[in-house]
């Protein structure tokens, strides 16, 4: 047996598996760009490419934390007022159930719980928005073009 060495030449077009136009998920002014975030550079998954001014987002998070803590206190106060109302109703000597749920503060307790749930949602949104002020590479990639500069508003 003998061996034969074949050589093949061809032309083609290379296409990426994934292509992405990266956009910010929150708005603001670009305060810092990574040195590696340049046209033609290869970036790694999770690498921070740019920072958006986070001042407003830090303030929003602080406010959301305060509102959440206030809602926790308000719910506990309302729960205790309901316990006190039930105790007063039982000590009054009246028979049966109160004519209205308002007497035992049940609607007020539900409203306080709803306020807490809303405050929790606002807090989670504020945390997420603050995290989005760091623009990161979603996967290992080649930067084809960089259409943002320091100071740009996105």
Over which residues does each language-model region extend?
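Periplasmic scaffold and linker elements that assemble and bridge Gram-negative envelope complexes
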Residues: 1-3, 13-15, 27, 31-32, ...
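Regulatory alphaC helix of protein kinase catalytic domains
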Residues: 6-10
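Conserved phosphate/oxyanion-binding catalytic-loop motifs
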Residues: 24
């Amino acid at each position: 047996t003998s061996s034969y060495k074949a050589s093949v030449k061809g032309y083609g077009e290379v296409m990426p598996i994934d292509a992405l136009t990266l956009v910010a998920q929150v708005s603001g002014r670009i305060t810092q760009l990574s040195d590696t975030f340049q046209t033609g550079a290869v970036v790694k998954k999770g690498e921070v490419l740019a920072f958006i001014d986070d001042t407003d987002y830090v303030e929003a998070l602080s406010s959301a934390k305060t509102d959440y803590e206030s809602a926790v206190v308000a719910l506990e106060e309302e729960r205790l007022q309901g316990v006190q109302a039930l105790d007063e109703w039982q000590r009054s000597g009246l028979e049966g159930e109160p004519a209205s749920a308002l007497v035992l503060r049940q609607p007020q307790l539900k409203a306080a719980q709803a306020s807490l749930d809303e405050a929790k949602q606002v807090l989670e949104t504020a945390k997420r928005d603050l995290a989005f002020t760091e623009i990161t590479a979603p996967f290992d990639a080649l930067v084809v073009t960089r259409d943002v500069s320091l100071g740009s508003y996105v």
